[in-house]
Amino acid sequence: MSYKHLISACIFSSLCLGQVNAVLAEDKLPPSNTSTGQHSELSVDNDNLWQRLLRNISLAWDSPNQELYIPLNTWHNRWTYDDDKIESYNERPWGIGYGKYRYDENNNWHAVYAMAFMDSHNEVEPIIGYGYQKMWIPAEMDGWRFGVGFTASITARHEYHYIPIPLPLPLISIEYNKFSLQTTYIPGTYNNGNVLFTWMRWQF
């Protein structure tokens, strides 16, 4: 494990988030010959999936709400791996992450985040992204929330020379007040991928 690699990964994630913020700031500026009111009307009329995604990322970025991420487990699917591979892999990653989040008018969760952790080969893996979950809040269970959604993320791995790799993934979470267990499944082929990655989120 290399502390220098982890620090570099965190800096890489921060720089990427900074670039996203700069792009979003430019995206929110109306043309010089268009009034703010006219621009708002045009945004609503011409809204599409990409524009909604950018708007949700921007709103999450501007939110004062913050989250801490702590990786807990990377479980490799025993039905898709040889035993010797399983024995050689790290399934107790250590790392840390930071995010900004908001709940919209429907109580659905939106967040932008950056995280760095030790991967299956004990090499540093950074990841940044946007996450969305549709939340279910049981009326009879005060403080509990259950979520299903997705993350649109970018990661980079040691064996691929830290070239940025797009990584859309599903998300599931169980939450109680400010604490959450969140997980995703990374699909793959035999002896590659097929990992259940779980982490803790703490909102502050």
UniProtKB/Swiss-Prot annotation:
Localization per Swiss-Prot or TrEMBL: Cell outer membrane
Keyword flag Secreted: no
Keywords: Acyltransferase, Cell outer membrane, Membrane, Signal, Transferase
SUPFAM superfamilies from the UniProt entry: OMPA-like
Biological-process GO terms, alphabetical: lipid A biosynthetic process
Annotated catalysed reactions: a lipid A + a 1,2-diacyl-sn-glycero-3-phosphocholine = a hepta-acyl lipid A + a 2-acyl-sn-glycero-3-phosphocholine; a lipid IVA + a 1,2-diacyl-sn-glycero-3-phosphocholine = a lipid IVB + a 2-acyl-sn-glycero-3-phosphocholine; a lipid IIA + a 1,2-diacyl-sn-glycero-3-phosphocholine = a lipid IIB + a 2-acyl-sn-glycero-3-phosphocholine
Record has Acyltransferase as a keyword: yes
Site (Role in the phospholipid gating) residue list: Y190
Record: active site: H76, D119, S120
Signal peptide region: 1-25
A single MF term (Gene Ontology): O-palmitoyltransferase activity
Main localization category: membrane
Annotated family: Belongs to the lipid A palmitoyltransferase family.
Quaternary structure (record): Homodimer.
Protein name: Lipid A acyltransferase PagP
Gene name as annotated: pagP
